[in-house]
Amino acid sequence: LMNRLRYNAKFLLLGAAFLIVILVLMYSVFSALSRDIESTRAELGGLQMLKPINQMTQAMQQHRGLSAGVLNGNEAMKDKRAAKEKEVAAAVMAVDAALSSTLREMPAWKAVRQDWDAIASQGLSWTPPENLKRHTVMIGNVLQFMVTVADETQLTLDPVMDTYYFMDTLVSKMPAMLEPLGITRARGTGLLTKKEISQQQCVDLASILS
């Protein structure tokens, strides 16, 4: 077929074929770059959401410790606890504002908000062990929600190994390591206030620290 064509027609046909190949390659490159851009944009959005969640978690852990002190009789901690309660409430609102509409409507986040509302309104009427337990359950739910945020924003799907390990440490390993220390601090605050410790409390502390 090519032999029957004039040179001008051959050049036009080859040029058209070459143009098609170039267009296909350009489309492939553009698609890959678009995916990278969208992935990067999602990751940046995830980091912007995780920052206030981390701050909220720390405030909740501190509120747990102060609550343990107050419920065990430390009157000097009442004002600090009240101030920390306002800080946590503001942090919860900041996280809610930072979340995407999809994440904001997730049952996991709504459960965290309900947990906090219950603690803020009823926490001082509970026994010290119950208060500690409810705080710890709430914080555990927050830590699990952090993983959900990371998954939804592709932070835990990063193909670059170094970045993946960094995100895994930030989202999973470090919070899992720090939370037992927070529980120990809360228990310790209560014990120091009461100035007494039972055998079961010794066992509980040992199990957390082991």
Regions found by a protein language model. Give the residues of each.
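Hydrophobic alpha-helical segments
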Residues: 1-210
